Amino acid sequence: DTDRSRGLGDVYKRQVFVDIHDEQAVEAAINEKTRVIFAETIGNPKLDVVDIEKLAETAHKHNLPLVMDNTVATAYLVRPIEKGADIVVNSTSKYINANSDAISGVITDSGAFRWDKEKYPGMAEYAKFGKFAFTAKLRNGLFRNTGACLSPQTAFYNLLGMETLGLRMERACDNAKKLAEFLNTYPDVTVN
């Protein structure tokens, strides 16, 4: 059985885009069909930073998992699960890899979200795996159907990049701070 229902098609049928910083807009967009709240830790391309704790509070109030894309920040700068996110995704091809010589990604499940069988019927058969239910669903459906399996060479490239991740992220932060301080001296440059 490799139909769409085995992947995440049963979860991601329709996307609604809202200003993730506008609490009222987020609340207004949530209805009985909403299944997940997805946001980027640091948005691309605006580089805006989301309040993960506030977003997690909103998601959990409505019994929704909060999925954070942490590609730009990486776990070196921000650990979304510690701030209330349920699932974190990263494109490792960017900062983690360092050289963009391999295409891959990582999904990290906190195991904290309790999948309601009524709201998420596709998760019912995975309830027996407890906190690993979402991971089991990914493995049985998405990974099996799309061939999402990291090759040894790609893993090697990612590990090489991780050796310098800390240094690179510190330098990026230092450079960003210096640039912001420099631009702050120009009255024609404003931050909205």
Where are these regions (language model features)?
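Active-site C-terminal subdomain of aminotransferase-like
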Residues: 87-90, 95-192
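Gly/Ser-rich phosphate-binding catalytic loop and adjacent alpha/beta segment
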Residues: 6, 15-29, 41, 46-49
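Single conserved hydrophobic/aromatic residue that forms the stacking wall/gate
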Residues: 1-12
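Short acidic/histidine-rich motifs immediately flanking catalytic phosphotransfer sites
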Residues: 30-37
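Buried hydrophobic positions in well-ordered alpha/beta secondary-structure cores of metabolic enzymes
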Residues: 37-40, 55, 69, 80, ...
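Active-site core of PLP-dependent enzymes with the aminotransferase class I/II
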Residues: 28, 42-65, 73-79
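Hydrophobic beta-strand scaffold residues
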Residues: 15, 66-67, 88
